Amino acid sequence: MSNTTRSSRVTIGRIGTTPQITDPWSSGLEKQRPSRCGGPKSLAEPTYRKIGRRKMMLHMRVHDPGTTVTQRAKETATAKLNRIYLCTFNRMAQSCIYFVLFLVILSPNTSCALRSSAGETQNYVGILSNDSATTTYDVSSLHSSRRTNPPSSSSSSSSNVDVDYRNDRELHKVDLVGLGGERAGQAETISGGKYDYNYENTHTNASAKDEIVERQSNSLDFDGVDMFGAFSIPEEAIYTNEFAVNIPAGKQMADVIATKHGFINRGQIGSLDNYYLFQHHHVSKRSLRSSRKHQGALKSENEVKWMQQQHEKVRRKRDGPYQDLPTYSPYNLLRQHGGYVVDPNPHLSFSPESISLASHSQRMEYRDVSSHFIFPDPLFKEQWYLNGGAKDGLDMNVGPAWQKGYTGKGVVVSILDDGIQTNHPDLAQNYDPEASFDINGNDSDPTPQDNGDNKHGTRCAGEVAAVAFNNFCGVGVAYNASIGGVRMLDGKVNDVVEAQALSLNPSHIDIYSASWGPEDDGSTVDGPGPLARRAFIYGVTSGRQGKGSIFVWASGNGGRYTDSCNCDGYTNSIFTLSISSATQAGFKPWYLEECSSTLATTYSSGTPGHDKSVATVDMDGSLRPDHICTVEHTGTSASAPLAAGICALALEANPELTWRDMQYLVVYTSRPAPLEKENGWTLNGVKRKYSHKFGYGLMDAGAMVSLAEQWTSVPPQHICKSRENNEDRKIDGAYGSTLSTHMDVNGCAGTINEVRYLEHVQCRITLRFFPRGNLRILLTSPMGTTSTLLFERPRDIVKSNFDDWPFLSVHFWGEKAEGRWTLQVINGGRRRVNQPGILSKWQLIFYGTSTQPMRLKSELLNSSPQLRSPSSSNPFLFPSASNIGQPANEGGNFNTDSFASYLNYQNIFSSAGSDPEPATATLDGQNVTAAIAGGSSAESLGFTASAAQLVAAPETRDGDKKILHSCDAECDSSGCYGRGPTQCVACSHYRLDNTCVSRCPPRSFPNQVGICWPCHDTCETCAGAGPDSCLTCAPAHLHVIDLAVCLQFCPDGYFENSRNRTCVPCEPNCASCQDHPEYCTSCDHHLVMHEHKCYSACPLDTYETEDNKCAFCHSTCATCNGPTDQDCITCRSSRYAWQNKCLISCPDGFYADKKRLECMPCQEGCKTCTSNGVCSECLQNWTLNKRDKCIVSGSEGCSESEFYSQVEGQCRPCHASCGSCNGPADTSCTSCPPNRLLEQSRCVSGCREGFFVEAGSLCSPCLHTCSQCVSRTNCSNCSKGLELQNGECRTTCADGYYSDRGICAKCYLSCHTCSGPRRNQCVQCPAGWQLAAGECHPECPEGFYKSDFGCQKCHHYCKTCNDAGPLACTSCPPHSMLDGGLCMECLSSQYYDTTSATCKTCHDSCRSCFGPGQFSCKGCVPPLHLDQLNSQCVSCCQNQTLAEKTSSAACCNCDGETGECKATSTGGKRRTVVGSGSAYKSSESKHGSFENDGNAREFVLRLDSPLTAITAIAVAICLLIITIFSIIFAVLQRNSNHVSRNSVRYRKIANTSSGRRKNLSAKPTSDARFIFNIGEDDDTDGDNSDDELDGNVGTDINNRIVYDRKGNDHGHEFYIESTNDIDAIEFHCNGAGAQKAETQLQRCNANGDDDDILHYDRHTNAERKNHPSSTTSRTNIRS
């Protein structure tokens, strides 16, 4: 009966009628069931489907008339139990087998955990990497794939890309124009590389509809590495009439070309030298078609190296689009005590009165944060992210930074957005016009249009630098920072606009904050264009005087479209700090995008009506008090400015921070704990938590400034590129299918480009897959960290390709690069895929350092007790991949180059690194390891480790060659194959090709292991492989002495000494010089040049011209602002200022004031007066009275309040405002009434601007240099162009001071003159002090040497030096030894001894080591093997059993597969069998290994990586599950006849009572009673025996009877008005059976008992048949 029939009249039916029931398993449904273990469903059928299917079957069994109960009874309870448990067990076992088999298949491709042959170690063969593989993982397919995959012929043709350059013996040339000559795997170092911007995009799309990728011959390249990927033009681009061109010949040539072809040269693009913007009036301003004619005209010019017609870009602000949400209300949120309320008037001003008017609401309640109210600013209480108002009292922890005095002073931040309101009362005091520009309007005023749509930039600016301690809005994070804005989003946006914004005044602006980007629509893949890319690179290489501009970017608001910020080329860049958002409660906001490029998080808005937003200033042109603030700033747009403000605090704490230092600080100090309520946190390989939502956690301002105070700049950045994997691989279109491929890299080990400590990792991918939004891409590092490079984007259904897109991940920060990297491409989307995709190419680019990057200031470490043990007590020190398990003397905190980032020259050279061989090879090309693998131990031979670290047995044969020991003098003790230096096994000095030599020839140098390697192409002689190691130069090159590089032209800051073909550095502060270091031709930014010297300000009697030079004033002027005698500001002695002139004597009506040095006007009526202003002669009709004042003739008889009118001839009253006068107007007063002041013949209540009160009642004018003053000698504001210093207005500040927006502020105490407040902004030093990199020192600091022109930087090889170049070192950095003035790294057979600062030879048994003695080995001399338990080189034990018993035995149990000591193989690296000449074996040997028995070859499980440990645990769990289920099945099988389960209700209903039975009539009757459902299950306790059923059930039913038959039967029918609350119906047969068995539902025997009774249970929906002894049947009814 249905649930819905609650009150209908329902007929149960005649008791004498028997419904016929059909078993669905024996009917049509039998065809759908393939086995007895389940129906037609998958093994992963959801539970809700199983339940629904069972209910349907039961319903069909009850109502299908095709099957009788007797037929169904044939399936016994035991058979059912067996079937159910056997099927369950079968499924579990099958799942475990599939899982184990999958791990066996997977492990050879990822971690090599399970292997049965040495060949499997190198050559991965499996389903996941085979193009023909399917998703059915069975053993037959495994064998098939192994048989069909051919082996590699040699190690060089391995299918897994191994970045190992042992066979690459030549240095390939680097094409200085493009990338054509770049060697795969080469890497560069930023500190001295050419930033080559000539990149050609060759990755076109499969179809024009996908996207039109512009081919560029001159894109931007960063040391040969394009970091941004292919830039694209929209499918329907709107072209403008502007053309960007690159003309290296300069502006004059650009003007000529523009004029020739009818263009107008609009000038240079931002700070990008030789890049100009052309405009043509005959080209449409907006067109869907490009102008090929004008493009061709520009391309025809040889001087035009690159050009691009500009097209509009779609760029969106990243504030929250709440207007699209139905729950959004634009009301202001106001604070009440104990809660928040919604103000119905959105324009209500933020005042206590307005707050009290609002009614209390219980909807939003947060903790009271009144204890944090330390600012009087009215909106500070709403800035919950600053005052502990987030959940659990958390915030951005800005308070400790403020308490230390860091408020952003001296730091300049610019907001790249839609402009900022410069006159906003909460911003005006901090506004910096030099950090601002209006690109849309092409002027210097960034004020946006006041149309309601351009508030974004102003709001962001308020978060950073809103003025504190005033009565407007709130406070900024860095409330004393200088704030500027760029108006760029309030009009068309193109590549030129972005480049201009990103390169605006990079020497002045420290931090750029941007809260915009491409569309966050879940389908766009876009990034910066070629000019914006160049602006980024120019910023990090040249901004902030070489320390690099800091770019802070909002990660994106595409969360509701499941967008990924890895598809945004701005946040996906290594140059930007990508910032995400967290809600007030510490959760992920609805708009957040997840990606692997996010570095950290700040608080922002959350769910409208639940989480608070950000309070800041607001744009309002009318400055209405109720419109200039807001509490509704939202999205990641609000997060990025908060991060920029925190970075400003850190920059104030340490102005020397580079752009990379800032990223390190953010990574090291961000806190995961406040955001750990949100899932998704993972530990990376150096035990640092990261999240795809929040990066490394919530930024911590207090921790950042504390660490910044101790921070020393990180070492130069190295860039290591892997080989490109160009093998096409199929991406299966089936849902859930995975393409897995891997790459073995060595991190460019052994080269100058080595990366041991990772920062950023880029994975450049080219693939085709439609739709590409289905894809999820994962990258796993050798340390087991998995980073998701791309999440599924369901809206990305139109495009099908990624063209060389560089997916960035910051999750590997601090890990090692060396080892196996695994890339997985997963089809995780539900959209249909018509054909498989193709992974065409992928490549890894590693950014990082070769030495420990974190090196705190040594003086702080030594003086502070809590910092003396950095590894144990400093909270900022983390373990790194390279120093885990290493001794303390490696990877220390010593600063090898404190000034590594001061001189950073761009466009100098392009590095061509090369990789030395890790060990010396024999002259015939055979590896020595293979040649002597069978020899005896090193101890028995008695050899010592030579420079080549080789030993050889006397009788060892290499093929058919016998090793001799009577050899050439150049052969070492290893012997030779014959006479002559070409037959040596190894060399005693150096090796050149196949010959041993005593010294390397010119244009080569000996590398670390004694091989003569060629110098860089520009070097004639060198000390290393790089272009910055030249000692002398190749022909037609100039030697840049201090950099040790060779160039064809001297770079800026150098002059050419043609006599000795060198480039000599100019003196400090010179940007360029000529013929002599002190003869400057241009100066650094913010400096001026006078007589070819650079100063912070022009000297006296000079003025600054437009070209930043100083010119002399006119001879009459002391200071001036122009060249003529009418441009004077102050005068020389004996001259007086009058109308911008300097006069010897003042004109009539003026007198010379010797105190003011000005010509002051005489009193009214005076013709001449003395120097003190006393009249000596009056004008006509004026008379000199007794007080020496001139009065009108005839006024002697007038009273004091009258004047004499010569027209009327009588006295007339003065104006009412005057006390006395000489005329009727209010401008004719000569004195004033009490409480009034006389100002220029007027009586006023107070002096106006430019006057001060003198003698109590007179307003005297300020000095002509002052615009405001409080007395004659105390100016408070100066005229335009003058500087205020201690109340005096001057043309230039005094020595020791600098101009800070018109006010002279003190320089750093060691500076004599300066350009700013920082330590490194000195321009001149006190006498006897030395200037080095902008700082003044008593002596040249470490890393500099004293020259005739100040301190010059040492070569980067040196720690200290006494001259330029790599041969002038006097001490070396750690791990380098001084040898004849040259710092050389220790050989592979040596270790660095810190006490003597020298390289010492390792123990004889060690090939490489980290210390003295035999227990410090890192590598061993064959045939010894490294025992990692004690770092000792030992031989293999001959008797393994004896070795296990004898712990002191100098041997180890060797692995039969690898030949190494057991448990010593390095995780993630390849293993090879010692003695094997190839890294690979044939397919026959691999196939044979599967068929060998266990005695022939051992099947080894190695726990050498995280994945293998997980594999072992998983296998053990599966085996345990199988064992447990086997035991359970055995027990249940034995007791199956006695078990009753809740789902199967076997119930033998007992007779109710003998007394009741006796009262019944003897004639056959039927009885029915209803059992009320009281919420219990009467068999949940389990019926253990028939006796318990007989004894208990009847009593229980009696207690629950609610209806009994009363009266006579009515045709064996009864009616129920409602089935509500009826649990079951019992049918009782009394007396002998009167019906025939075949027509009865119930058959009663002679005793009145039921024979066959059908029970329908409402709880289980299953019918059961009772035993014949039952007397009562129950039919449950579904109520």
Swiss-Prot record:
Question: Which cofactors are required for activity?
Answer: Ca(2+)
Q: Where in the cell is it found?
A: Membrane
Role this protein plays: Furin is likely to represent the ubiquitous endoprotease activity within constitutive secretory pathways and capable of cleavage at the RX(K/R)R consensus motif.
User: According to Swiss-Prot or TrEMBL, what is its membrane topology?
Assistant: Single-pass membrane protein
Domain named P/Homo B: residues? 714-852
Regions of this protein lying in the Cytoplasmic compartment: 1533-1679
The protein's annotated catalytic reaction(s) are:
Release of mature proteins from their proproteins by cleavage of -Arg-Xaa-Yaa-Arg-|-Zaa- bonds, where Xaa can be any amino acid and Yaa is Arg or Lys. Releases albumin, complement component C3 and von Willebrand factor from their respective precursors
Q: Name the gene.
A: Fur2
Q: Which GO terms describe its molecular function?
A: serine-type endopeptidase activity
Q: Polar residues bias located where?
A: 1-10, 439-451, 1668-1679
Which residue range or ranges hold the Peptidase S8 domain?
Answer: 383-705
Q: What is the name of this protein?
A: Furin-like protease 2
Question: What are the annotated disulfide bridges?
Answer: C473-C629, C565-C595, C720-C748
What PROSITE patterns does the database record attribute to this sequence? P_HOMO_B (PS51829), SUBTILASE (PS51892), SUBTILASE_ASP (PS00136), SUBTILASE_HIS (PS00137), SUBTILASE_SER (PS00138)
Q: Where are the FU repeats?
A: 961-1006, 1009-1056, 1060-1104, 1107-1152, 1156-1204, 1208-1253, 1256-1299, 1301-1346, 1348-1393, 1396-1443
Matching SUPFAM superfamilies: Galactose-binding domain-like (SSF49785), Growth factor receptor domain (SSF57184), Protease propeptides/inhibitors (SSF54897), Subtilisin-like (SSF52743)
EC number annotated for this UniProt entry: 3.4.21.75
What's the short name of a Pfam family annotated to this entry?
GF_recep_IV
GO terms classed as biological process: negative regulation of secretion; protein processing; R8 cell fate specification
Q: Which family is it part of?
A: Belongs to the peptidase S8 family. Furin subfamily.
What tissue specificity is annotated for this entry?
Answer: Transient expression in a subset of central nervous system neurons during embryonic stages 12-13. Expression in developing tracheal tree from stage 13 to end of embryonic development.
Residue stretches of biased makeup (Low complexity): 147-160
The residue ranges crossing the membrane are: 1512-1532
Instruction: Tell me the active site.
Output: D417 (charge relay system), H456 (charge relay system), S637 (charge relay system)
Q: Which residues are glycosylated?
A: N3, N109, N130, N205, N442, N480, N927, N1060, N1181, N1274, N1277, N1439
One Gene Ontology term, aspect cellular component? plasma membrane
Q: Which CDD domains match?
A: FU, Peptidases_S8_Protein_convertases_Kexins_Furin-like
